[in-house]
Amino acid sequence: MHATGQVISFVTPFERSADAWRKGLNSHLPSSVRVHWVRRVTDDFPARFSATGRRYLYVFQEGEADPLARSRVTPTGVLDDAAMHAAGQCLVGEHDFTALRAAACQSPTPFRRVDHVMVRRYGPFVVIDVAANAFLLRMMRNIAGALVRVGRGEWRAFDLQAALVGRDRKVLGRTAAPDGLYLVDVQYPDHFLADALDRSAGWPPGRLPPMLQHRHSLDRL
């Protein structure tokens, strides 16, 4: 799994400037993780439980595995992205997502509100874009696993809807691998982090993750 919009919070007895915290944290983090900004918040702000919405992308790449995109996408055969997009619309709205949650999920309720499901193609890349108020454990990877079955012609839109209504996790089959998963945005009430989160520069729907945009550009040459 990858993240371009992760927000975390922590409690500390130490006093440092925001820039000192950012530089200090980055000096101890592995090269694959970077802190972009730091802000002081009130005591009633836990980053996880204050969030009002989250957005994930899942990226499949058709054809043979690309060594330059290794661990950043999930390789697959040819997909019908239009069929995947159409099938995904049955997930929009508030539903019982028992069929799409992992057995180890500890959420007290299986109900979640999905705001949009979009599937778009960028050359060999097929991107699934889902926004919701919250996600159950492995819910996004299970959505990707179900939609790829539609894309391969193994399922129709009706089959996904029937699985959702039937609330049977076993019907969906395999969970998609973590490689193609990206957390791209976390939403908060306006009074939290208003000066840090630039909503006008939000992630455009269905956009390809930055680390894959160069691959798409090369394919179009």
Task: Kindly give the residue locations of the regions a language model identified.
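Structured-RNA-binding interfaces characteristic of tRNA pseudouridine synthases
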Residues: 1-221
